[in-house]
Curated annotation (Swiss-Prot):
Pathway: Cell wall biogenesis; peptidoglycan biosynthesis. Belongs to the D-alanine--D-alanine ligase family. This is D-alanine--D-alanine ligase. PANTHER family: D-ALANINE--D-ALANINE LIGASE, D-ALANINE--D-ALANINE LIGASE B. The lineage of its organism: Bacteria, Pseudomonadati, Thermodesulfobacteriota, Desulfuromonadia, Desulfuromonadales. Its main location: cytoplasm. It catalyses: 2 D-alanine + ATP = D-alanyl-D-alanine + ADP + phosphate + H(+). Cell wall formation. One of its GO terms (molecular function) is metal ion binding. Residues 105-301 form the ATP-grasp domain. The keyword Nucleotide-binding applies. It is an enzyme of class 6 (ligase). One of its GO terms (biological process) is regulation of cell shape.
Amino acid sequence: MNDIRSRKIAVLMGGLSAEREVSLASGAAVCQALVARGFDALSVDVARDLPLVLSREGIGAAFIALHGRYGEDGCVQGLLELMAIPYTGSGVLASALAMHKLYSKQAFVSAGILTAPFHHFRRGERVSLSHLSFGLPLVVKPVQEGSSVGISIVKEESQLAAAVKLAFRHDDEILVEQFIKGQEVQVGILDDRPMGAIEIVSRNEFYDFEAKYTDGMAEHFFPARLEKGLYEEALRVGLAAHHALGCRCYSRVDLLVTPAGECYVLEVNTLPGMTALSLLPEIAAKGADLPFEELVERIILSADLSVKTG
């Protein structure tokens, strides 16, 4: 929308999810960048009075810097659609699909995109190796959480019960996936084009919450250490996953690239982190020569509504 520069912008941050602290850091960085680029922006710590706050402050556009439940799952997007406030990132449906790991995996399978074999369980259902079509090792995760919250790698049968209990602590539905061994590669998307792919080598067993948000807990390699043809394939698969869910403007797609050269999609992050340690800003800077402030400006200028009214 061409008149975004003249509007008062709310940077939506914090919120009610398990990723609240990360969101506060993302929001603070985004708000500072918007002000530095000359926008009239204020930070809003999202609570249940959000509609009143947006109306009272005369907000004309929103930069969504929320992560996890209520912010990344289509809830806030639906509210902003009802209030006719243009917002950044994907719309209601794409946000909900990306946040729900079962439905996103089904969309990937339908689009011919590789994703790890999986089984879905609801609270109260028995989870045992005999119920699975694959063996150890495996991954147990909540259906709807981000930042690797509630995820476990299970290498021995004795670890399964604790992993299932942890995942159900965060959701009423869980996925049990076949463990795929490979390089952890993340593709950054902006304006519906891939900017590049970065490789992550975690000091922990996998790229978990601690490794994502603690300085020094992971090494980053840009571009990802893949031969040229495989690197291009990773970019293609990342963009295909973005499109398979109907995402808008920007996202970060997490992949595993196997020694056999297969690219498995883990998930699509419709509202990737925007902190000093976050991967999308690093990919933008190194892959598209786009400093953080310019990245934030590009994103806010893409703010829009999915439902157009006359």
